[in-house]
Amino acid sequence: MPRPGGSYSTSDLSRKSGDIIAEALRHPVTITQRNKPRLVLLNIDDYERLMRQYDARSVGTLETLPGELLNEFEAAVDAYGETDETNR
């Protein structure tokens, strides 16, 4: 039943859900439908790690801002300040 890379069809999932879930607890498993990847099953720890990693609301400071992004931010603030002064 296992396929290279932990990939299973939806039919496999219907027949052997217990085995596939047990594998998904160890590493992500791809579920295919009509030979195309459609879903990924992964354990809750991996899911929560991914959600934290990509949460747009994550907190940061100017000290933790990457240099390139800080430069862009400073340039935007300067441009805004110049525009504001010329409009007065």
Curated annotation (Swiss-Prot):
The lineage of its organism: Bacteria, Pseudomonadati, Pseudomonadota, Alphaproteobacteria, Hyphomicrobiales. Belongs to the phD/YefM antitoxin family. SUPFAM superfamilies: YefM-like. NCBIfam families: phd_fam. The keyword Heme does not apply. Keywords: Plasmid. This is Uncharacterized protein y4eA. The keyword Transcription does not apply.
